């Protein structure tokens, strides 16, 4: 019997890593699309920045990980590039950071400043994933690591929410979310939000936190 040593996940069925990643993207799509409808500029800008940083960091990491060792042999740029990326940089190295970028975008508020998104995305992918060895080796969720770092460093900006046509109550600009109020220890604090509004997402919160209806659609 031949024992093959590979990184997780280890599967014994037809589904593969690529298929699982696509399933995750499909599940996230309803919430992401609705976020783009409600906050078109904020969502798209944050998403593009997160995608560029996380996929770019993955690309650089693969190149450094598989580069030629230092020696006296002269090689062309093409040879070095093919050695680093051919067979090593696959569709999974695009899909996995893309998923992290989408999740990171959805767990950040629409009003988050661009510099917080940039720093959070970079810290998330590097500290949360790449330092552990990359795909299949990380023990933390890169999106969660990035969000926590951004929240710790830019706490005041993190609780700033942008009123829109969908949710334009004046006091929605800043303050605690329903989840934050529950975390404060009292369910009574959330009675200011009608159940229908909480279900439809007409409450303050991060992009992917408030739209319960689209989250359920993604689950289905």
Language model features with spans:
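N-terminal signal-anchor module of multipass membrane proteins
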Residues: 1-59
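Hydrophobic core segments of alpha-helical transmembrane domains in multi-pass membrane transport
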Residues: 28-35, 50-60, 104-106, 122-125, ...
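C-terminal ends of transmembrane helices
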Residues: 56-72, 79-82, 125-136, 217-220
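A generic, well-ordered mixed alpha/beta core segment in the N-terminal half of proteins
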Residues: 75-82, 93-168
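Short, amphipathic, aromatic/basic-enriched membrane-interface segments that mark the entry/exit
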Residues: 11-21, 62-67, 82-92, 108-112, ...
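Structural signature of hydrophobic alpha-helical transmembrane segments
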Residues: 42-52, 111-120, 203-212
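Long hydrophobic alpha-helical segments that form multi-pass transmembrane helix bundles
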Residues: 136, 142-216
């Amino acid at each position: 019997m031949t024992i093959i040593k590979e990184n997780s996940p280890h599967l014994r069925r037809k589904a593969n890593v690529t298929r699982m990643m696509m399933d995750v993207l499909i599940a996230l799509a309803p919430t992401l699309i609705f976020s783009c409808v409600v906050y078109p500029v904020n969502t798209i800008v944050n998403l593009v920045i997160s995608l560029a940083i996380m996929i770019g960091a993955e690309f650089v990491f693969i190149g450094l990980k598989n580069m030629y060792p230092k020696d006296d042999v002269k090689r062309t740029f093409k040879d070095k590039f093919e050695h680093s990326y051919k067979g090593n940089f696959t569709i999974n190295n695009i899909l996995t950071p893309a998923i992290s970028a989408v999740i990171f975008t959805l767990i950040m508020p629409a009003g988050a400043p661009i510099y917080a998104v940039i720093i959070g995305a970079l810290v998330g992918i590097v500290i949360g994933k790449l330092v552990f060895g990359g795909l299949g080796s990380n023990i933390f969720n890169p999106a969660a690591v990035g969000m926590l770092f951004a929240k710790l460093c830019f706490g005041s900006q993190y609780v700033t929410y942008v009123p829109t046509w969908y949710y334009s109550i004046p006091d929605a600009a800043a303050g605690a979310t329903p989840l934050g109020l529950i975390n404060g220890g009292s369910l009574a604090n959330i009675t200011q939000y009608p159940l229908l509004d909480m279900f439809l997402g007409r409450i303050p919160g991060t992009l992917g936190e408030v739209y319960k209806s689209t989250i359920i659609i993604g689950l289905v």
